[in-house]
A protein has these predicted regions:
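Short, acidic, Ser/Thr-enriched surface-loop or helix-capping motifs
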Residues: 41, 91-92
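General small-molecule cofactor/ligand-binding pocket signal
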Residues: 83-86
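A short, flexible beta-alpha/helix-coil linker loop
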Residues: 5-7, 88-91
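AMP-binding/adenylate-forming catalytic core of the ANL superfamily
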Residues: 1-78, 97, 101-104, 109, ...
């Protein structure tokens, strides 16, 4: 498994978000991606994906393809609750994706922005998607 914050618990199954991201990242239209675990009343947590498209790629049919790829490569328990195509992912100046911040906002917490954030405008643009 990887770091503790990269492991989510879906209905009693421990899943690596990194493994799910690896599947999403193999799609030819995906430039970069992130997967977070969001709270779910029934399963505890469910995986939710965010993808940035490569230049010239379209999102038509992409979500269905990504969900199917995760189900095929990892299994139904890892099936993504939702996949959002976004313009950019929030990162630190060193390039680390701010998954903890994304997870907190998605779960409805007032998550402070880390001082190391590269561009606070990215999280501001992503906030409506995270809370919906």
């Amino acid at each position: 498994m990887g770091r503790t914050d990269d492991v989510i618990n879906v209905a009693g199954h421990r899943l690596s978000t990194g493994a799910i991201e690896a599947v999403l990242g193999t799609h030819p239209s995906v430039a970069e991606c992130a997967v977070i675990g969001v709270a779910d009343d029934i399963k505890g947590q469910v995986p939710r994906g965010f993808v940035v498209l490569k230049a010239g790629a379209t999102g038509e049919g992409l979500v269905d393809e990504l969900v199917a790829a995760v189900r095929e490569n990892i299994g139904a328990v890892a099936s993504l609750k939702r996949v959002d195509v976004v313009a950019a992912l929030p990162k630190t100046r060193s390039g680390k994706i701010l998954r903890k911040t994304m997870r907190g906002i998605a779960d409805g917490r007032d998550e402070p922005l880390p001082s190391t954030i590269e561009d606070a405008g990215v999280i501001d643009a992503l906030r409506p998607t995270l809370v919906s």
